[in-house]
Structure formats: structure tokens, C-alpha cells
A protein has these predicted regions:
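C-terminal regulatory/interaction regions
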Residues: 95-96, 127-252
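His/Asp/Glu-rich metal-coordinating catalytic cores
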Residues: 1-85, 89
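Structural recognition of alpha->loop->beta junctions
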Residues: 33-37, 119-126, 193-195
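General beta-strand structural signal in soluble alpha/beta enzymes
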Residues: 13, 42-43, 77, 100-103, ...
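Active-site catalytic pocket residues across diverse enzymes, especially alpha/beta-hydrolases
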Residues: 30-34, 94, 236
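Hard-cation-handling environments
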Residues: 50-163, 224
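Short, glycine-/Ser/Thr-/acidic-enriched flexible segments
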Residues: 9, 17-19, 47-48, 82-83, ...
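Beta-sheet entry/capping signal
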Residues: 10-11, 39-40, 74-75, 97-100, ...
Length: 252
């Protein structure tokens, strides 16, 4: 989120956000202590056209992975490298004595986040991550554990080394990537004997959108990143909702 202050006006630009992530509980503190009342909220509205339902939290995904690690010796997770909160959460699901593996690029990103944020939250303390060298893969073969994978030939070769009957591949991304025409993800998911979805939305639910708007108490709400901007009015009936077109300007 960005709080923009200029010429006596205060504008809150939310970007994509959600309250069911690992840090969702601190949102009220941020709104109360750091933001307060604003004149305008420019907010994402990805979910306003969807039916309301309780969003699965990142902590619930972590619990599912713990269960999969008890059921399967080898758990492979396909998720976005930039979804670092999920990588931190799932890495912490791996029990002592088992391996947690990712490639060098993913490990570097995790370390950058840990270096900057671990002093503010223990959640971001550096987890024990290994990169897939021959000795590590031998240990993974013997003890099992969790491996973050990407759709490429390197990980395809690695996955084929392990018994598919003792393996599961968890698809932890937006399903549209998998179902789009000519996607190579279905073929990748077939490398193990079993695959399952393990994902939750990266966007705020309608109730969470309403909650943040009411907290910020703006006079004007401007929806963006939505296929149904007109539905924003039903979420905040006591606010003025302005629907802007691309390149259209609004003077406050």
C-alpha cells in the first residue's frame, strides 16, 4: 500500500492486498497507526464480481502440507518464486530430519527478505534450505521432505529420480496458468503419481475490501483491477464511487 499526501489531500493506493495472508492480522494496526482517515482510496476490486466465501489462509495451506509430508515421502511444490510468504510458511512445515530444497535463485530471494525483515518478525528468519546438489539429492532420496520446483528440464530430471508412488506434486499457483491453451503445466504435474491443488487467492475478499474502506473512511473510492467496477458501490454504499477509464484524469 502507498499513502500519498500532497496539497492537503491524502490518497491511499492499496495495490493488490489480502487479509488472509501470513501478516493479515496487522492490517488494522497499520490502518489505525500509520494511515488513519484519507480523502480517497484507490483500491483493487478483483473479487467484487465473485460470490462471497471464506478465504483459505496461508496457515491452513501450511497445515495441509504438514499432512502431505506425513502421507508422502516426497512432496514437490510448484509455486511462484515471488510468492515468498508461501515459501517461508511451507519451508517451516518440514519436520526435523527431512530435507527442504529449492534452487539457488529461490534461496537467494528468501535470504534477501530474511536479511531485511527477520529483525521485525520471526516468521522471516532464514529457514534451512538446501540446493539440489548430488549429496543433497541422495539425502532427500533416503529421508524425503519437500522440494520447491519450477517447470523446467532441470526439475523434470530431478523429479523422475524419485518413486512416483511415494510422491505428490502440489500445484500452488493460479489455476488459469494450468488450464490455458498450450500450457505445459499439466504434463509437468503428471511426473508424479499424484498431484493436488494447494492455493488461495492473492486478492482481498469483498468483506475485506469493505473493511479496509470503512477503516480508511474516504469520501471517494476509485476501483481498479476489476472486471465489475460498478459493483464496488454495493460494498461501500455510504461512499462516492468514481469509475475512471484508462487515461482519464480526476482532480481532487
Amino acid at each position: 500500500m502507498f499513502l500519498i499526501e500532497a496539497d492537503g489531500k491524502r490518497v491511499l493506493y492499496t495495490g493488490d492486498f489480502r487479509l488472509h495472508g501470513v501478516r493479515g492480522k496487522v492490517m488494522d494496526k497499520i490502518l489505525d497507526r500509520r494511515i488513519g482517515k484519507v480523502d480517497v482510496v484507490v483500491t483493487e476490486g478483483t473479487t467484487v464480481s465473485r460470490s462471497e466465501h471464506k478465504a483459505v489462509t496461508e496457515w491452513e495451506l501450511q497445515k495441509r502440507v504438514k499432512a502431505y509430508l506425513r502421507q508422502y515421502k516426497y512432496v514437490f511444490v510448484l509455486c511462484a518464486t515471488t510468492n515468498l510468504d508461501r515459501i517461508f510458511a511451507l519451508a517451516r512445515a518440514v519436520p526435523r530430519g527431512k530435507y527442504c530444497i529449492c534452487d539457488e535463485y529461490q534461496k537467494t530471494l528468501v535470504k534477501v527478505v530474511s536479511d531485511h525483515w527477520s529483525s521485525l518478525s520471526t516468521f522471516y528468519e532464514m529457514p534451512k534450505l538446501n540446493t539440489p546438489g548430488s549429496c543433497i539429492l541422495q539425502g532427500f532420496q533416503e529421508r524425503g521432505g519437500l522440494m520447491f520446483v519450477r517447470v523446467n528440464r532441470q526439475f523434470e530430471r530431478i523429479i523422475r529420480q524419485f518413486d512416483p508412488q511415494q510422491s505428490i506434486l502440489l500445484y500452488s499457483m493460479w489455476d488459469g496458468y494450468r488450464t490455458k491453451p498450450d500450457s505445459n503445466i499439466p504434463e509437468f504435474l503428471s511426473l508424479t503419481g499424484t498431484w493436488a491443488e494447494l492455493h488461495t487467492s492473492g486478492h482481498a475478499s469483498p468483506n475485506d475490501l469493505r473493511h479496509v474502506i470503512e477503516k480508511a473512511a474516504p469520501e471517494i473510492v476509485i476501483p481498479m483491477h476489476t472486471d465489475a467496477p460498478q459493483k464496488m458501490q454495493t460494498l461501500c454504499q455510504n461512499r462516492k464511487v468514481i469509475l475512471l477509464k484508462d487515461r482519464e484524469e480526476l482532480l481532487l
